[in-house]
């Protein structure tokens, strides 16, 4: 219902995808049902080979690797987003590339769940549209950038790895991914840009900052707590750390009460 609602909405501010969990929790019957119910022009999002069990289960139950299974069910394509892709081989990456499917890397989630490090640098080299995400592990994209940077250096034993790839994923890849669902141009700061999405950060460095070292300043010097003002679609949502679009104190109080009740339900 939400997907249909989003398709009918003409604000270009919301979009829907067919949400799937992971291959090891999705039967063939559910795959068929998703194919049947998915509206035209909409893709899927699904966790792929996040853990080794996902791959082992797919090989055992279906006799094929995960990306092959998704391809056989027509899940792949330019509107579909694959999360993680840790245990994928060259053939699977080629299949992702050939179908123009999108991938999102979630470094802290992978490390926190002790899942491993995906071949993300290889995916970028192959020309797969790759973005940077969090899988809910953090809400600070600068933090995700910093962790991705050191994770791939460590995994590849290469101090030069990820310097260029990760900011490319964050600033270019994420915008291109979003633009497969939204019409307005995203990921740019220029006069007349339809999105008009801006954040203002309180960052006053002691060392020079210019176009040649801006990525270093952003990665090492900036974090989410420095955001002072946010603008979305031309509307100021927060100014000088004051939220303007809701009663922040009430929202926080309601959240704390809901969290308390949820904890009581879980532990009862």
Model-assigned labels for residue ranges:
Residues 52-64, 92-97, 114-123, 138-156:
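Histidine/acidic-residue-rich catalytic or RNA/ligand-binding cores of hydrolases
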Residues 1-86:
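Metal-coordinating catalytic core of metallo-dependent amide/deamination hydrolases
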Residues 32, 68, 93-94, 121, ...:
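Alpha-helical segments flanking ligand/cofactor-binding loops in enzyme cores
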């Amino acid at each position: 219902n939400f997907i249909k609602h989003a398709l009918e909405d003409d604000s270009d501010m919301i979009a829907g995808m067919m949400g799937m969990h992971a291959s090891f929790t999705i039967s063939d019957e559910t795959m068929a049902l998703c194919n049947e119910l998915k509206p035209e022009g909409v893709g899927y999002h699904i966790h792929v080979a996040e853990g080794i069990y996902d791959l082992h289960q797919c090989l055992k139950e279906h006799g094929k690797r995960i990306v092959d299974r998704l391809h056989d069910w027509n899940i792949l394509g330019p509107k579909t987003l694959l999360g993680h892709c840790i245990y994928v081989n060259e053939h699977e990456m080629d299949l992702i590339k050939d179908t123009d499917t999108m991938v999102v890397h979630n470094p802290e989630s992978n490390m926190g769940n002790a899942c491993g490090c995906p071949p993300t640098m290889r995916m970028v080299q192959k020309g797969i549209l790759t973005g940077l995400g969090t899988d809910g592990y953090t809400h600070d994209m600068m933090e995700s950038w910093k962790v991705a940077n050191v994770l791939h250096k460590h995994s590849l034993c290469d101090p030069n790895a990820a310097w260029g790839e990760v900011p490319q994923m964050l600033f270019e890849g994420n915008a291109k991914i979003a633009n497969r669902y939204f019409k307005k141009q995203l990921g740019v700061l220029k006069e007349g840009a339809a999105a008009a999405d801006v954040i203002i950060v309180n960052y006053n460095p002691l060392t020079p900052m210019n176009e040649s070292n801006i990525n270093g300043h952003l990665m090492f010097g900036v974090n989410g707590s420095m955001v002072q003002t946010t603008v979305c679609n031309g509307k100021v949502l927060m100014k000088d750390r004051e939220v303007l679009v809701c009663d922040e104190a009430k929202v926080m109080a309601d959240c704390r009460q809901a969290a308390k009740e949820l904890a009581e339900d879980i532990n009862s």
